Design a protein with these regions (language model features):
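Flexible internal linker/loop segments at domain or repeat junctions
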Residues: 165-177
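Alpha-helical packing segments of well-folded alpha/beta enzyme cores
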Residues: 127-130, 190-193, 239, 243
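Short glycine-enriched, charge-decorated loop/helix-capping segments at active-site entrances
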Residues: 57, 224-229
Length: 252
C-alpha cells in the first residue's frame, strides 16, 4: 500500500504469490503477461521450527529455493535482462552432505535431521548454486538475461524476529530487536546490493554482491566471493535436477 501511494496505482501491479504453494506460484506466473526487465527473487523465511509446505517440502528449502526456482522458471521466457536472487552470509552454514541427487532430495523433503539455522543456511547456499548454474545455462542456451546473487549483510528488518516469534520465545525476540537497533545497518542500505545488481550497467553475469564493510555485515555494495562449495558445478547440476523434479518446472 505504501508503494502504491508513493508511486501511483497506475504504475504498481500487485500479484498474489505464496511461495509455499506451487499452485499459487503457477497462478501468479500466469497472471504476469508483460515482459520483465528485472526479476528479483527476494522473499524468504528464516530459522523457523520444522514444518513443511503444502507440497511437502521442508519449509525453508521450499520457500527460499524451490518456490523461487519454480516461479523464475515459469517466467523465464518473459525475462529480458536480469534475474537477481537474494542470498545471505548464512550460506556459510549450508551443508548438503555428499551432494548426491538422493541426498539433496532428502534435504528438500525434510528427511534429514533438522536444525533451523542449518536449514536456513542450506536454502541460502541453494540460492547461490541456483544463480551460478542459471548463469551457465543462460550463456549455453543464449537466453537474453544474466543471473546475479546478492546478500544484504546484517540489516534491520523484521526477518530476524520471525523465528523467536514462531517459537514463542519473548526474550530471544527482544534480544534480536536489540541487536537490530545496535548492530544492524538500516534496511535501505541492506537493499543496495540488490539495487546495484538490478541496475548497474555492464555488471558481469554471475556476479555476487554484498556490503564492503567488516565481515560483509555493513556498508556499500561490492563484488564479494561466496564459499567455494557454492561454485561446485556438480552439486549445482544435481540441485537443479532435483529442483526440476520436485517443482515440476522444467527450464528447457
Amino acid at each position: 500500500e505504501r508503494v502504491r501511494k508513493e508511486i501511483s496505482e497506475e504504475r504498481v501491479n500487485v500479484v498474489r504469490l505464496d511461495l509455499t504453494d506451487l499452485t499459487s506460484v503457477r497462478s501468479a506466473a500466469r497472471t504476469i503477461e508483460e515482459d520483465i526487465d528485472v526479476l528479483i527473487l527476494n522473499a524468504g523465511i528464516m530459522a523457523i521450527p520444522f514444518t513443511t509446505t503444502l507440497d511437502g517440502f521442508e519449509a525453508q528449502m521450499g520457500t527460499n529455493h524451490l518456490g523461487h526456482f519454480a516461479f523464475a522458471g515459469l517466467l523465464k521466457d518473459r525475462v529480458k535482462s536480469r534475474i537477481v536472487t537474494v542470498s545471505s552470509q548464512a550460506h556459510l552454514m549450508g551443508n548438503f552432505g555428499d551432494g548426491s541427487i538422493e541426498t539433496l532430495r532428502e534435504f528438500c523433503l525434510g528427511k534429514r535431521p533438522y536444525k533451523p539455522w542449518g536449514a536456513y543456511g542450506n536454502s541460502k547456499l541453494a540460492n547461490l548454486l541456483f544463480t551460478f548454474e542459471l548463469e551457465r545455462k543462460a550463456k549455453a542456451n543464449s537466453w537474453p538475461f544474466h543471473a546475479y546473487a546478492v546478500h544484504p549483510g546484517y540489516s534491520n528488518t523484521n526477518l530476524q524476529l520471525v523465528a523467536p516469534q514462531a517459537k514463542g520465545k519473548l526474550v530471544e525476540e527482544r534480544m534480536s530487536a536489540l541487536a537490530n537497533s545496535l548492530i544492524a545497518q538500516p534496511a535501505w542500505k541492506g537493499a543496495l546490493p540488490t539495487l546495484c545488481a538490478s541496475t548497474f550497467p555492464d555488471l558481469y553475469g554471475g556476479s555476487y554482491l554484498g556490503p564492503d564493510g567488516l565481515f560483509e555485515m555493513r556498508g556499500y555494495p561490492k563484488a564479494v566471493r561466496a564459499r567455494s562449495i557454492a561454485y561446485d558445478q556438480t552439486l549445482a547440476s544435481n540441485l537443479w535436477s532435483v529442483s526440476e523434479e520436485l517443482s515440476g518446472v522444467s527450464w528447457r
